């Protein structure tokens, strides 16, 4: 049992709620005093607390009991900046609302709420996005528009987040960065309140090892549970993988993927197990994505025992995802001018170019039941020499509008697949080597007549 609440002593201090004033200093003082005294639990009395960035220390549990709501300040100057990693590159960025940085054996727990009130940052991003796209700067707007994360765990170990609700984050919900032995248990994440929040991922596991995510319910506007390891030249420089991740007993609602690997793949992603999961309205059950300048390998991904409904794909795999975001090109009018450091980082080429070619291999998806799927599968390598390798999909039942496509693969295997689809719809196959594409008992709708093998 790695729970940091064990053996840490009694409640250290109670803070009285007052939402009309900024409580950051008072809460932080209680956390710091608790840590100096050898650790323990900081308890907040029921009520609303307005706060800026808080920093949890080693040996401390911040307890958010039922009836406690932390209201994040909407003013970005209440979040001091420091060097971190954002969307795959290291740069200066505002602190999160709750931060656990360079600490051990710390936690946040309870049945309370962290309301990040992030709409001010959503609106800021959408306005900047319009301006930047018109200038050919889509690739950098996500980095120029600084927004506040909900929770950051960075360079820390033996950390637990348990039981509370996280909502309306200005940027990513919970980022686990350069850390190990972290547990996320029973969080409810809801970023679909009061607007469309860009980049409001639920949980991001970023160049970290030995991570458990369980019993979580994630409703967001980007990847629900996402696994990352840096991007492009900067990610290849850092070269730290994410590995040994277990995701179980979770529900993904609106979002881009129940489990997503990428698009930041530079340090590699390996040894991921997901089971007993549910997808309700998210875009993909499993999404793998990268780009031709990311590099790294996604491998040894296992996903089983999944129920899905109203999803776009059961599997989506793309080596060349979202080019307008993935590739950085400086418009001519900026040439020769002074540009920010993070622009230079993004514009640094990967040399030799082959170092940036990503690999996806050894992926296993089984025991999936899916209803109302737009397209069963969309899996595409890049060319003859850069294929998706060793994919195994089996024991899957899906009702789908379109079977989908499989292109540029090697040893791609589908067996015991039952699709309910229109007879005229056939799966598109192109440039696949040593593959076994076999749909058994494929049926048509609405009368469910056996249609045979849909591959051609």
Predicted regions and their residues:
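Surface-exposed acidic, glycine/proline-enriched linker/cap segments
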Residues: 79-98, 125-148, 329-355
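Right-handed parallel beta-helix
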Residues: 28-35, 66-67, 96, 104-113, 116-173, 180-193, 237-239, ...
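Single conserved hydrophobic/aromatic residue that forms the stacking wall/gate
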Residues: 1-12
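Glycine-rich beta-solenoid repeat tracts in large extracellular/virion proteins
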Residues: 53-56, 69, 73-74, 96-101, ...
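Beta-rich accessory regions
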Residues: 31, 275, 292-456
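Acidic Gly/Asp/Thr-rich repetitive segments characteristic of extracellular carbohydrate-active
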Residues: 14-43
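N-terminal extracellular ligand-recognition/capping segment immediately after the signal peptide
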Residues: 39-85, 91-94, 99, 113-114, ...
């Amino acid at each position: 049992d790695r729970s940091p609440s064990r053996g840490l002593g009694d409640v250290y201090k109670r803070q009285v709620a007052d939402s009309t004033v900024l409580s950051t200093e008072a809460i932080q003082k209680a956390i710091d005093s608790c840590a100096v005294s050898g650790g323990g639990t900081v308890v907040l009395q029921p009520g609303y607390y307005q706060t800026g960035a808080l920093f949890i220390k080693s040996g401390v549990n911040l307890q958010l009991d039922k009836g406690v709501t932390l209201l994040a300040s909407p003013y970005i100057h209440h979040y001091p900046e420091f060097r971190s990693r954002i969307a795959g590159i290291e740069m200066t960025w505002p602190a999160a609302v709750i931060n656990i940085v360079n600490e051990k054996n710390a936690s946040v727990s309870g049945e309370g709420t962290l309301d990040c009130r992030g709409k001010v940052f959503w609106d800021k991003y959408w306005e900047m996005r319009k301006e930047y796209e018109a200038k050919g700067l889509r690739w950098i707007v996500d980095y120029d528009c600084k927004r506040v994360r909900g929770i950051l765990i960075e360079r820390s170990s033996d950390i637990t987040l348990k039981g509370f609700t996280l909502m309306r984050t200005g940027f990513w919900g919970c980022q686990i960065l350069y850390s190990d032995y972290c547990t996320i248990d029973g969080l409810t994440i809801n970023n679909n309140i009061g607007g469309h929040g860009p980049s409001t991922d639920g949980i991001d596991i970023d160049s970290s090892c030995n991570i458990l995510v369980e019993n979580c319910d994630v409703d967001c506007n980007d990847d629900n549970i996402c696994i990352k390891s840096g991007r492009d030249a900067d990610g290849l420089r850092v070269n730290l993988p994410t590995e040994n991740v277990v995701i179980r007993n979770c529900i993904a609602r609106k979002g881009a993927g129940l489990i997503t690997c990428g698009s930041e793949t530079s340090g590699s992603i390996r040894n991921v197990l997901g089971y007993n999961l549910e997808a309700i309205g998210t875009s993909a059950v499993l999404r793998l994505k990268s780009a031709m300048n990311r590099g790294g390998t996604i491998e040894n991904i296992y996903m089983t025992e999944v129920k899905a409904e109203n999803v776009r794909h059961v599997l989506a795999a793309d080596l060349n995802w979202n080019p307008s975001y993935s590739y950085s090109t400086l418009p001519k009018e900026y040439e020769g001018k002074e540009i920010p450091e993070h622009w230079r980082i993004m514009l640094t080429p990967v040399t030799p170019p082959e170092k940036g070619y990503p690999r996806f291999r050894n992926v296993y998806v089984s025991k999936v039941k899916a209803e109302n799927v737009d397209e069963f599968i969309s899996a595409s390598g890049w060319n003859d020499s850069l294929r998706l390798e060793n994919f195994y999909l089996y024991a899957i039942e899906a009702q789908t509008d379109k079977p989908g496509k499989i292109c540029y693969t090697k040893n791609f295997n589908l067996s015991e697949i039952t699709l309910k689809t229109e007879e005229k719809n056939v799966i598109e196959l192109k440039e696949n080597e040593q593959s076994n594409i076999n749909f058994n008992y494929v049926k048509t709708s609405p009368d469910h007549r056996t249609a045979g093998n849909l591959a051609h």
